[in-house]
């Protein structure tokens, strides 16, 4: 699965359509982290071919309700019909209600405290939870220290809540070592690196190889 980041990344709404459809053609699921929890930010990526959305800074029931209304058709929501890549081959409009995924991003103590209620009420609509470690650390007064005791406690509590509701749980991670660490502690969704980071790594690898000729 590929996550396209419209909140902090180099993608923007005008250039994700072709990229999403390329992913569709090679059967690579693509999730779009939207800029904010508003209808036009959530609905449009699905029209352009995204397989789901990730809602950043989720810490209220109203945000979850807005997300569901913005991406689901009747009887679950109020999404409008349209877009060049809304439907996959063989789908009808109601298939989208079960085939497009909603992930919420927990990035604060407020979000952690409300997560059980969110998953109790809307668990049938939420595919999984992604932790935003940097924003969470900053909001807890930890700076960018995402491995301090306070953060480890917060992350573990989030994992426990997701396991209670049998929901996928993951986090943005710096590398495979961090992914392995959290895999052993219950996570099953690993958002590793960025498109620019991967590009830089591959450029460095190719340069090193050429320099060895």
Residue ranges of predicted features:
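C-terminal alpha-helical cap/extension of soluble enzyme domains
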Residues: 79-88, 100-110, 150-213
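Short, acidic/turn-prone active-site loops that include or flank metal/cofactor-
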Residues: 6-10, 58-60, 193-199
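Hydrophobic faces of well-ordered beta-strands that scaffold small-molecule active sites
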Residues: 2-4, 30-34, 53-55, 102-106, ...
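Alpha-helix-loop-beta-strand connector modules within alpha/beta enzyme cores
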Residues: 12-35, 39, 43, 47, ...
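Glycine-rich, proline-tolerant flexible connector loops at the mouths of alpha/beta enzymes
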Residues: 1-18, 131-149
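C-terminal helical cap(s) of enzyme catalytic domains, especially alpha/beta-barrels
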Residues: 19, 61-77, 143, 196-213
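Non-catalytic positions within long, well-ordered alpha-helices that form the structural scaffold/packing
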Residues: 46, 119-122, 183-184
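Conserved anion-binding
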Residues: 40, 50-128, 133-138
């Amino acid at each position: 699965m590929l996550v396209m980041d419209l909140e902090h990344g180099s993608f923007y709404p005008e250039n994700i359509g072709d990229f999403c459809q390329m992913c569709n053609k090679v059967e690579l699921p693509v999730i779009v982290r939207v800029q904010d929890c508003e209808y036009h930010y959530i609905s449009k990526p699905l029209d352009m071919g995204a397989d789901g959305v990730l809602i950043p800074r989720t810490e209220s029931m109203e945000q979850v309700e807005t997300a569901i209304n913005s991406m689901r058709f009747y009887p679950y929501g109020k999404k409008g019909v349209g877009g060049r890549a809304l439907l996959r081959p063989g789908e009808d409009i109601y298939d989208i209600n079960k085939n497009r995924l909603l992930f919420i991003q927990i990035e604060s103590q407020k979000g952690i405290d409300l997560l059980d209620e969110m998953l109790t009420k809307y668990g049938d609509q939420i595919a999984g939870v992604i932790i935003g470690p940097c924003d969470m650390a900053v909001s807890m007064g930890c700076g960018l220290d995402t491995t301090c005791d306070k953060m480890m406690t917060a992350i573990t509590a989030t994992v426990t809540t997701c396991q209670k509701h049998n929901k996928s749980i993951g986090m943005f991670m710096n590398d495979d070592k961090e992914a392995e660490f959290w895999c052993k502690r219950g996570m099953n969704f690993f958002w590793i690196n960025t498109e620019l980071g991967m590009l830089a790594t591959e450029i460095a690898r190719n340069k090193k190889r050429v320099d060895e000729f």
